[in-house]
Amino acid sequence: MGISQVHYCNGDQNLEANLLDHEETESFSVPQTKNCKRWLRVSIYAIFVIFCQPLATVLGRLYYENGGKSTYVVTLLQLIGFPVLILFRFFSRIRQPKSTDTNFSQSPSFTTLASVYLCTGLLVSAYAYLSAVGLLYLPVSTFSLILASQLAFTAFFSYFLNSQKFTPLIVNSLFLLTVSSALLVVNTDSENTTNVSRVQYVIGFICTIGASAGIGLVLSLIQLLFRKVFTKHTSSAVLDLANYQSLVATCVVLIGLFASGEWRTLPSEMRNYKLGKVSYILTLASAAIFWQVYTVGCVGLIFESSSVFSNSITAVGLPIVPVVAVIVFHDKMDASKIFSIILAIWGFLSFVYQHYLDEKKLKTCQTKPVEEETQTL
């Protein structure tokens, strides 16, 4: 009787062990599947960002090269396609399962949300306009390389707003990106700027630096807002912020377009466009579409990872622009510009590697309590 009981108990234990192994295998395969889907989404968003921003930038320069003169139009191209994000929000809402979390966190008040959307929208309109002025006066290759300094500004503002630590890798990135931009401003004589005076070149440089600073400030603010204001990190919160700030920025730029009187010159500008009326419309429409696909990619990366990661992926596409500029616009590619590209890529890699180390450290801290809990059980 005792032996049969032992066999019965052993059988129960084996059955329980098999069931536990089966449950562990199923629970392990589900996160793996989710992780693969997440990285597939991240890859798609990254492709949107890497390729669409350079294409939109080149099309903006093509508009200027062939008779376009309105900086407000180029600014508007970066913003006016925001209704695409409304569709993106609609589909993400369908896909997102209903939350069963009983811990309800209070949503921000209407006044708080309105203030956030208004302030970020004004900042977005400001840096979009500054980048349009910079693109007008600078060769597109120089413009894109200076714009890479947005990584340095993101780290700088995150130090004050988000307690970002200045590790040796971050300091190295800041130094390299600063030197990369400085090389371009001291080497104006070698640039192909026959239609631009030295004063206009300096104005373009200052405006592009200002645009980079604005991008860094907005991304750091977004990170701060999702820590202090939008405590529930949902796709709806990310997309609402992107939609409403774009709406505010678009309204501000439209007011500027009509107040400046530039809208009166648009019909004659289209008639006198060197590539023809159809090309004029296609250039502007394509640029607006590429900018919005780029925005969808940025918003997706912010939601899937972080604003810092989104900004890092943005910087990957910037070295593509100088290569395209040499082919399309015959920009000069001298030794100083090549060295500037190398420094910018080096600074970017340093920044991304630090982000990788931070993510790895965060995952280790999150998994350690779980491992300790399983060991105690």
UniProtKB/Swiss-Prot annotation:
It comes from Arabidopsis thaliana. It is a multi-pass membrane protein. The chain crosses the membrane at residues 39-59, 71-91, 107-127, 128-148, 166-186, 202-222, 238-258, 283-303, 309-329, 338-358. Its main location: membrane. This is Probable purine permease 22. Signal peptide: none annotated. The keyword Endoplasmic reticulum does not apply. Keywords: Membrane, Transmembrane, Transmembrane helix, Transport. The keyword NADP does not apply. GO terms for molecular function: purine nucleobase transmembrane transporter activity; purine nucleoside transmembrane transporter activity. It holds the Pfam family PUNUT. Belongs to the purine permeases (TC 2.A.7.14) family. It is found in: Membrane. GO terms for cellular component: membrane. InterPro entries: PUP_plant (IPR030182).
